[in-house]
Amino acid sequence: MSCIFFTGGAEVAETVYFLPKDNVDIAKNPDRDYLIVGFSQPIPEEYIEALQPDLVYLPNYVDGDTMAVEKAAYLAFTRLQWDLRNKYGINVALYDGYRTVADQQWLIESGLATYTTGQPGYSEHHTGLLLDIIVEVGEYYYSELAVLTDESVPEEVKSSTAFNTLHEILPDYGFIIRYPKGKESYTGIAYNPSEIRFVGSKEVAHAIMDNNLCLEEYISTLTP
């Protein structure tokens, strides 16, 4: 996506907040939660086939186009979204989730890919667990990556505490920053705080985030 920040009115569709019941179970699926896809690790074809019944389709909050997210990841995101709004006064929205291999090819061919975009078949967006999020600061929704890299972003946005608050509570909902700073040698992807990854449980997410690990490092600790 070429846009890096978005207006708060005309361009961002109205967010529909959903509060799940407390007893809704988020099933843990290690084969899915710990799957790594990257430049040397393609998405298994059997994974894509098995994922299809577990995709939730919803409007993209930026332009209203249909997007998809793995259902457990989406349920966890709605809880995160609700609490951010009602406890902290912070609005967040999704603007990308699951991508097919064809979607990834189109991004590259259309010139909309960024330097963090993987090749078709080698993007963790194919898992449905990697979410691109934007945060409302003032009149606009911003990608945090844009805040860090675009000189035109106002200073008051760069100094907003909304992004830090988001980072602090992500693990409570089973999310991590997928491509953290200083972990490029492990992930193969440049730092991108706008992409969060569902890992199935808050315990795992805290083990990763609290110890300044990336997903690759954490998984290596599970291997004898």
Predicted regions and their residues:
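Extracytoplasmic cell-surface/polysaccharide-interacting catalytic and binding patches
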Residues: 2-97, 101-224
